[in-house]
């Protein structure tokens, strides 16, 4: 354990202790204690939660590792967007990228992706992947506008702990 690291506290770098991006309308920063309920409500409003994924567990897991975090965007002191970001040392992945339905079309999604990319670049990561659910065609065009394109690999999956599977 790091010196000064308190049990139950997530280790934070200098990067995570400051706002990532701040503008006249939007401030993007790492998730803070007390933000969890608002972030989960945002994910639910955006249709990102699934019965087999416990969003509170996903948040805790991402926050408990130095190679991942959850970024949030605030407008008028309300959480209006998020991006979960992590990496394996050279390849970064973004999950739960979303903007509150009432706030879409204001450029917040672009700013969230840019903040997640900046988070990865600061850690020496040079490639970013996005996870997009099958059938979510509307968001694919958005990501293509940002320079993302279908890759040459296909994601395959296996539940290695069947008890966690739930109803797919």
Regions found by a protein language model. Give the residues of each.
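Conserved N-terminal entry element of GNAT/NAT acetyltransferase domains
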Residues: 9-34, 161-168
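Acetyl-CoA-dependent GNAT
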Residues: 26, 30-96, 100, 113-115, ...
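Active-site acidic-Proline motif in GNAT/NAT acetyltransferases
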Residues: 100-106, 134-135
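Residues forming the Rossmann-fold NAD(P)(H) cofactor-binding site
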Residues: 110
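Conserved GNAT acetyl-CoA-binding A-motif
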Residues: 120-132
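Conserved beta-strand-loop-alpha-helix junction that forms the acyl-donor binding cleft
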Residues: 130-139, 157-161
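Conserved active-site tyrosine of GNAT-family acetyltransferases
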Residues: 143, 148
